Curated annotation (Swiss-Prot):
GO terms for cellular component: cytosolic large ribosomal subunit. This protein binds to the 23S rRNA, and is important in its secondary structure. It is located near the subunit interface in the base of the L7/L12 stalk, and near the tRNA binding site of the peptidyltransferase center. The keyword Metal-binding does not apply. Belongs to the universal ribosomal protein uL6 family. PANTHER family: 60S/50S RIBOSOMAL PROTEIN L6/L9, LARGE RIBOSOMAL SUBUNIT PROTEIN UL6M. GO terms for biological process: cytoplasmic translation. Disulfide bonds: none annotated. The gene is rplF. It comes from Clostridium novyi (strain NT). PROSITE patterns: RIBOSOMAL_L6_1. Keywords: Ribonucleoprotein, Ribosomal protein, RNA-binding, rRNA-binding. This is Large ribosomal subunit protein uL6. Part of the 50S ribosomal subunit.
Amino acid sequence: MSRVGRLPIEIPNGVNVTVTPENVVTVKGPKGELTKAMHEDMNIAVEENNIVVTRPSENVQHKALHGLTRALINNMVVGVTQGYEKTLELVGVGYRAQLKGKDLTLNLGYSHPVEIKAVKGVEYKVPEPTKVVVSGIDKELVGSVAANIRVWRKPEPYKGKGIKYAGEVIRRKEGKTGK
């Protein structure tokens, strides 16, 4: 069995999990509700306070799907109970972030400010002008939105300027050496 897939997922108090015959998993919790369609080959069962994922065969594809399915369901359970957040840091002279309503405005050294519209299911917070916190209950969506913000100014290797994840180490290069 898959080392990840064989572990049961514990359902915390206040969380309700339903699985349809078409393998559509719905998880409701204190922070919200998530629904995701899983691969039809996987067998997903709710037993007492646990979710158990089993696979039909020892096929290589089924082994991979087994761990994936279990991880996706676990991410949904964690999302509706605790939520997810990614912190981005703006490094560079004049690089600033601010909220306008629910939308995010970034000054990144371009001739115009970058406007990032609010995405349903994701919330932006700006605790400092050089920090942006992207939070929500869907891990995939939070990561995707954070990556889309980072794309506007990826950190460059010479001075390290740009938008980076909190805790991300930028591989630095040495500049040209003079004579």
